[in-house]
């Protein structure tokens, strides 16, 4: 496209959740942990900008006292050499920021799980453009509309299923690398 090929994607997503080991964030019986709670957003956004599924997956995870992943560092690379760097945490606030770097521009998306604006910076002259689409307050309505479209047979909505499958494979690979199983998987 007009930005050139995407080379690198960097994403941060950090929330500060109090250590309440019974709540959904840290309780393994409730599928707690950073990967399933917030990582799914980061991995999905990255996969949408990649030409193919990453084949190199490296990561480190720090567990919460319950054993679920509290903080994750994830590095991905696909066959085209596109790389992704993710930093996720449930116990340290950081901006929800995505940076998609291409040959001719980079795109910055703040609050990306519910963003309604992105900033494009052209690398040759530093010129910036803002793109605004939708409303943050309507984020869940958009998810429901996409689900309804996919169920009703809309081909473009069903294409998202391939992305979702890739994201699930990545999350399973990461959990396997960490040797982390939820109680019902043991």
Language model segments and positions:
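Active-site loop of classical SDR/Rossmann-like NAD(P)-dependent oxidoreductases
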Residues: 131-145, 159
